[in-house]
Amino acid sequence: MAEYCTYEKYVFKKQLETLKSKNGRSTELISLYIPPDKQISDVTKHLREEHEQASNIISKLIRNNVQEALHSLLAKLRSLHKIPENGIVYFTGTVDTGANRTGMVNEVLFPPEPVADYIYRCDSVFYLEPLEEMLRECTTYGLLLLDLREATIGMLVGRQTEVIKHLHSTVPGKQRKGGQSAHRFEQLRRIAIHDFYKRIGDATSEAFLELDPAELKGILIGGHSPTKEEFNEGGFLHYELQKKVLGLFDTGYTDESGFSELINAAEETLQSIDLLKQKKDMEIFFKEIATESGKISYGEDNVRANLEIKAVDVLLLSEELRAERVTLKCRVCGYENKRTRKWKTGEAVPAIGHCPECDSELEVTDVIDTVGELSELADKGDARIAFISTDFDEGSQLMIAFGGIAAILRYNTGV
């Protein structure tokens, strides 16, 4: 099966790429972000106010375009009975389609994570930054912040952080009270520190051991030095969780506000972990090529054939692959054919061309997303789907040398 969010992320990324390529001739493209807790009546009221204000736009063309977009949004809201769990995002407006022509865009996106803020923006481009932030891997990491005063345990799921538990310590400060020897005071202080570390370890273990081991990708520990190092080296975490510690990071805060600081400090570590998984898949692929085991396949037709007989263990797809299977028909002579057209992110979709029989223009009668089709076949055959970045050599080779589509097989099929 595909890893959580893998194919959904690909589809979502494609939608954003399409919207990013659209431009208005003026500030007439509307982006509307509605959080799950927003009242539809409040949004409707706001859009009516915007419609009234738009009547003051000097340019008749821009005024009509903006008001038409607002009419479209109001019509959609009338048919919306409830805001979805993660909120909803609308993009609408008149875009430049080239050759001095324009067209209307009406797109609705259901975000993979909750929309945080209500946003209404009218500009010459669509406002996509909040959705682009959601493209981060939908994985779960444990978070732990600690110093000798407090500890905060939480989780990072996608880009959302959640506090699980907050602990306060009874560790005394470094200034001893009168009547105590320095040695006795330090001894009692070390006992209090040890007890606090144990409380942190027990609470962290209780929180994270409840999760599916495959779901928890790792644990990030932040705080002051040498406190976090002492805790990590002291064996206070359950041994299964200790193996998942990805690194220790300096943070100024150890309450909930320190989570974003910890995540930013660990950014390179988190990125490298995802790339390591991808590199491992590609290493296996190239190893099978080198040993001539026959347990690999590449090229759309061969991979499709192996998927259909459920022989694929891992389906390898380049993140940069954009491909569609199109059915072409000539209305003049009746010629019909199916063809896959490919392009890279940021490139224009290739033109269809002319009929090879009579040189008339071909018409597209059906379009199927190649990645979606192959992913469905992979799911039916219980194959894992791995989207491979081009940010490392082997990932680039998958796109350049193998057309962005390959597979590791369960056995040699001869295909």
UniProtKB/Swiss-Prot annotation:
Reply yes or no: does the keyword Protein biosynthesis apply. Answer: yes
**Transcription is among the record's keywords:** no
Pull one GO CC term from this UniProt entry. Answer: translation release factor complex
Q: Give the domain of life.
A: Archaea
A GO molecular-function descriptor: translation release factor activity, codon specific
Q: What is its main location?
A: cytoplasm
Name where it's found.
Cytoplasm
Q: Which UniProt keywords apply?
A: Cytoplasm, Protein biosynthesis
Q: What Pfam families does the annotation carry?
A: eRF1_1 (PF03463), eRF1_2 (PF03464), eRF1_3 (PF03465)
Q: Which family does it belong to?
A: Belongs to the eukaryotic release factor 1 family.
In UniProt terms, what function does this protein have?
Directs the termination of nascent peptide synthesis (translation) in response to the termination codons UAA, UAG and UGA.
NCBIfam families the UniProt entry points to: aRF1_eRF1 (TIGR03676)
Q: Which HAMAP family match?
A: Rel_fact_arch_1
Quaternary structure note: Heterodimer of two subunits, one of which binds GTP.
Q: What is this protein called?
A: Peptide chain release factor subunit 1-2
> Can you name the source organism?
Methanosarcina acetivorans (strain ATCC 35395 / DSM 2834 / JCM 12185 / C2A)
Q: Which gene encodes it?
A: prf12
